[in-house]
Amino acid sequence: MNGRRSFLRGFFAVLLSGGAIEGVMKLFPSKALAKEAARTGKWYGYGVSVDKCIGCARCMDACKNENNVPKEPFFVRTWVERYITRKNGETIVKAIAPGDEATPEAASDRTILRSYFVPKLCNQCANPPCVQVCPVGATFQTGDGVVLVNEKTCIGCRYCIQACPYGARYLHPKTHTADKCTFCYHRIAQGQLPACVEVCPTQARIFGDLNAAASPMSRFLRMNKIHTLKPGLNTEPKAFYANLDGEVR
């Protein structure tokens, strides 16, 4: 027993040393580097207050205009889903398009228990499967936690599109490369908000540095009961939801 205790003490002493941490990072580079970045610098996250979303689709319009996303409704970097839960337990989900009626559902329909909107986008995972499957390194994670795509090196193999559990990627019909939400990286690098956050009339969308205690994101996380999508997949998403129903996946 004493020998076992001595071994464990020695094991944990080595584990806590810098050399052991470096070894772990070599074995699990994407996850370890994400954790390291989260501790040392800016680490961007996104919040959605579901009860505030009115389904106006201004966010979708702003995103398309800002990022040259094709106008066709099936090409999106961010989208909004309408959820209708009926009293019999049935849940109906439909993605809305710009110009759709914003009212979740007629109040006169007595079969409806609840109707609401859920904005969705790339979850900017701390442990992103899309980065891990890219055979040429075109999909990568920045030091501040944003997953981007290098159009110059992307070969359009679609592996990342298939690997994304959130359905947040598509193949751009003109560039033939993978495309997705980037948190409007060109804007946030200059201290601006993502276009979708800036135009939201109800402040249902929130953005900020998770490591800054006074940032809108940090306040959002402190003041709400928070959920993430598909938490069991160990992707460590950085899109956080308040007032999210269990039906949402």
Task: Label each region the model flagged.
Residues 27, 32-36, 58-80, 127-153, ...:
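Iron-sulfur cluster-binding cysteine motifs and their immediate structural context
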Residues 106-107, 113-131, 238-249:
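Short flanking/linker segments adjacent to small metal-binding domains or redox-active Cys/His motifs
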Residues 22-62, 232-234, 240-241, 246-249:
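C-terminal segment of N-terminal export signals and the immediately downstream linker at the start
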